[in-house]
Structures are given as C-alpha cells and as structure tokens.
C-alpha cells in the first residue's frame, strides 16, 4: 500500500539524518538537566564534567564494539559478563558523583527522571519489536 511505502521512506530519511556530535548531545543534556533540576552555575560545571567523561567512555566503547562487529568478532560469554559488569560499575560511580553535586531533592528528582526515561525506552523498544514481528 502507499501508506506502508511512505513509512519505509520516512525510516530511510531518519537514517540519513545527521547525528549530533557528542559535545552537542552533552550540551543539550546539561541544559535539560539545568531546567528540570534548577542547577546553579557550579552544579552545571560539575555535571558538564561528568557528562564529558561518560561521553568519552561511551565513544571508546562504541568504537571497540564497531571494530569487532566489522571483523565479525562476537564477544564470548565471559567478555559479555565483563562488559556488563564494567558498565554497572561505571553507572555506580556516575551515580555517586552526581549525588555529590546535587541536593537531596535534586538527586531524588534526577533518579525519578532516569527511571521514567528507562520505562519510556522500554516501551519504545517493545513497540519496535511488535512492529517488526507484524511485518
């Protein structure tokens, strides 16, 4: 149908869209946090550092993952465990850093926002999975 073809065209256009640079993503995330949590200037500077560290680590991980994928190398069960373990350790460290910067009220709100974002992401992933299985 024409409608189905339009949907595919839109998906392709989305893939061609330019991605934001890590710096742009960090800047937008910082501004959103500033608005949502009412961050003061010193908090903004500290959060910006945390976001930059996270971004650098994420870029390095993605580069490694892409290089392995291009070579056709899949991680072993042990490597997957190590990666997940490392990711959780980093999440704990980030949480501790953020907690030092924010007030208890801000931290509670940040935790709530993260939880809501995870739930929204889960819903979107389920919708995508349902859409793919229907095709």
Locations of the language-model features?
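Classical N-terminal targeting signals for secretion and organelle import
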Residues: 1-24, 41-42, 67, 78, ...
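Amphipathic alpha-helical segments
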Residues: 19, 25-101, 109, 113
């Amino acid at each position: 149908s024409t409608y189905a073809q339009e949907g595919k065209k839109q998906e392709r256009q989305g893939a061609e869209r330019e991605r934001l640079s890590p710096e742009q993503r960090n800047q937008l995330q910082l501004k959103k946090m500033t608005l949502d949590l009412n961050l003061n200037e010193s908090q903004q500077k500290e959060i910006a550092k945390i976001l930059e560290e996270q971004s650098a680590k994420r870029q390095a991980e993605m580069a490694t993952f892409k290089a392995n994928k291009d070579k056709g190398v899949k991680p072993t069960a042990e490597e997957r465990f190590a990666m997940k373990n490392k990711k959780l350790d980093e999440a704990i460290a980030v949480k501790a850093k953020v907690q030092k910067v924010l007030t208890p009220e801000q931290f509670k709100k940040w935790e709530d926002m993260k939880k809501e974002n995870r739930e929204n992401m889960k819903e979107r992933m389920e919708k995508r999975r349902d859409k793919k299985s229907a095709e």
